[in-house]
Amino acid sequence: MIILQTQRLTLRELTLDDVDFILALLNDPDFIRFIGDRNVRSVEDARKYLKGPIESYERNGFGLWMVENKAGTPLGICGLIKRDSLPDVDIGYAFLPEFRSQGYAFEAANASFAFARDTLKLSRLLAIVSPENDRSIRLLEKLGMKFERMFTMPNDNEELKLFAINLS
């Protein structure tokens, strides 16, 4: 199901048909370095991973979405996540290396912000990012998000930067 469209992009719900793309994205060295190793090494692992976003659509009315160009080429994922460890919804995104530095993440994230504000009526949005991920930090700042504090996820010892923006 298509959720959002921008000038260049379509954001749609992930499906089990997206296993090959998810397998490639989650094994990209930058994904593993900056976001984390999800231990997705096979098509079956990718199917299991995809159940998370699919269940989030049903439970929350949002989740991580596939980002495609107008030709239908998968570029990355972007969307909204509700984590038990955070007080508010956060935004997440990741793109294949060949589609970075072309403004796609900014465009997809901007559309996700508008969805969070206008459709979900959220007043605040968070983002968590590795302190070493300079490109992602610059993107969050360009989107108007402000650094609030360092944050550690439960069951993880890596400190992350927590960013926030008021949408209302």
Predicted regions and their residues:
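Short glycine-enriched, charge-decorated loop/helix-capping segments at active-site entrances
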Residues: D37-V40
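Short amphipathic alpha-helix in the helical subdomain of ABC transporter nucleotide-binding domains
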Residues: S42-A46
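Acyl-donor (CoA/ACP) binding surface of acyl/acetyltransferases
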Residues: M1-F34, K51, M66-S168
